[in-house]
Amino acid sequence: MSDRIQPLDAIGPVPGSGQDSDEALNDPAKVDYKAGREYLSKKDYVQAAVCFHNALRGFEEQGNDQGVANAHDRIGDICMEREEFGKALDHYQRAFEICRKESDIFSLVALNKKKVLAYRKMGDLNLAMAVMMDILDHYTETRNPKGSVEVLEMIAEVYREKGENLKAADALRTIAGIHRNFGHKRKAEDFDKRALKAEQE
């Protein structure tokens, strides 16, 4: 038995024990990002914003584009909750540019949906419509009928907000046609009725 005492700073987890496997614990930007998500889930937007801004700076210093995009996306979400729609759009657009550079199609669509909501909240229905048409093109190209139906419903709503009821009816009839093609008779009839109602308003 030895009388020598091991220095405290030499004591750490046993290699391979799993205690040192979480690299996020060693990355302040990831720690801040994780804390921001926790605050956001509790609707503590001030603390969440502080954490995400700190994470953003850390990710930028590391050159971690994915982290930068994620932080901008979350900060945009906070701005939406605080009804700061212009700021939200700025953050979503920054995330969008990174995702476009990375050819991350799914993230691009998700960000576009958030941008549509921000434009609608700001009353900029023409820009909302332009972005929705891009989303619809994506769903058409990828043969995604569920996604197409979702965005066509949004398009119909915006046309109605703009007072363009005939165009809203066309979008609703397109949805009815999609449902009819998949044998969803009742849903097709429902959308046909909604189209007729939109025309008569």
Features from the language model and the residues they span:
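Long, contiguous interaction/recruitment modules in multidomain scaffold/adaptor proteins
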Residues: 1-27, 31
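TPR/Sel1-like alpha-solenoid repeat signature
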Residues: 32-39, 51, 58, 68-79, ...
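Terminal, low-structured helical/coil segments at or just beyond the last alpha-helical repeat
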Residues: 2-9, 177-201
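Flexible helix-coil transition and linker loops at the boundaries of alpha-helical arrays
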Residues: 19-23, 59-65, 99-103, 140-143
